[in-house]
Amino acid sequence: MKKKYRIKKNDDFQKVFRRGKSFANRQFVVYTLKQEEASHFRIGLSVSKKIGNAVCRNRIKRYIRQSFHELESQINPENEYIIIARKPAANMDFHEVKKSLIHVLKVGRVLKQKPNNSK
């Protein structure tokens, strides 16, 4: 995922926190805010120092970024997302992180449904 698609500035984080909607599961909290003129979604990541050491926190962030990269075609491009990792995320592998993110994005109804062509 390109760096221009990441949320880095505190003002941008605060805007999404204040105006956006949130939804959560045990591992992640996701805030989302609709941006009308955006051509691509942006994501911001937050992993507290209470969660593991730096290696563990960076691994979680890599897993989240890669999950969003793989789900890119299903994610609404007009939104900004902030993902906050909770403690249970520290013990998860990539596939568990991706599955948990899919679940929380479906809860928030921001994930497009795949067309069902199994007939």
From Swiss-Prot:
One of its GO terms (cellular component) is ribonuclease P complex. This is Ribonuclease P protein component. It is an enzyme of class 3 (hydrolase). The keyword RNA-binding applies. It comes from Listeria innocua serovar 6a (strain ATCC BAA-680 / CLIP 11262). GO terms for molecular function: 3'-tRNA processing endoribonuclease activity; ribonuclease P activity; tRNA binding. RNaseP catalyzes the removal of the 5'-leader sequence from pre-tRNA to produce the mature 5'-terminus. It can also cleave other RNA substrates such as 4.5S RNA. The protein component plays an auxiliary but essential role in vivo by binding to the 5'-leader sequence and broadening the substrate specificity of the ribozyme. PROSITE patterns: RIBONUCLEASE_P. Its EC number is 3.1.26.5. Consists of a catalytic RNA component (M1 or rnpB) and a protein subunit. Keywords: Endonuclease, Hydrolase, Nuclease, RNA-binding, tRNA processing. The gene is rnpA. It catalyses: Endonucleolytic cleavage of RNA, removing 5'-extranucleotides from tRNA precursor. Belongs to the RnpA family. It holds the Pfam family Ribonuclease_P. GO terms for biological process: tRNA 5'-leader removal.
